[in-house]
């Protein structure tokens, strides 16, 4: 059993970001033209020059910086990069803007599990392969808390009933990866608590991925059996053996 320790710096950052995104929501809530197509650009325009500089804390924002996908192509696994220093530690928080229904219990796509693993483990390849070797120094720095990484969600309710901001590390619900499309999915109003530490989060994510892949594998095996049965029936029909005992 993994002890889920609270990441205190991440708890501070989460509080600061909630305050910031409350301001952002107040600036856009009465804009009837805001929708899922222009939300990203609007948020970026409001935050690209925004800076917090306090004792032991510096926060800045920029467009996504991804070595594989381009921001212009709208294919990056997040929409806004928050970065800076807290208590002498560098941090990166990848933020995904969403325009949806806060009252719905439906799970919504965030990004593929592959993208989340890339971001948290510092993997610089598009797809996971057996040739990938994890950067031990980088991951150890994150496990030990010397470097902070997180993924945040900013949700604007499409019916203008408010907003939410939270980190994936704060979600108390079980993680879910859709076995059909490999998407990490969440409800927009999940149960939240203090953010868990890096190791506990990544392990929880990998466990959810493994569960999803096992479901997918079992489904594929069943489909193979069904297709083989159909093929045999098709051959028998062609050879005039249908209806025979």
Curated annotation (Swiss-Prot):
Keyword Transcription regulation annotated: no
Entry keyword set: DNA-binding, Endonuclease, Hydrolase, Nuclease, Restriction system
EC number: 3.1.21.4
One Gene Ontology biological process: DNA restriction-modification system
Coiled-coil residue spans: none
Summary of the function given for this chain in its UniProt record: A P subtype restriction enzyme that recognizes the double-stranded sequence 5'-GTNNAC-3'; the cleavage site is unknown.
Protein name: Type II restriction enzyme MjaIV
Organism: Methanocaldococcus jannaschii (strain ATCC 43067 / DSM 2661 / JAL-1 / JCM 10045 / NBRC 100440) (Methanococcus jannaschii)
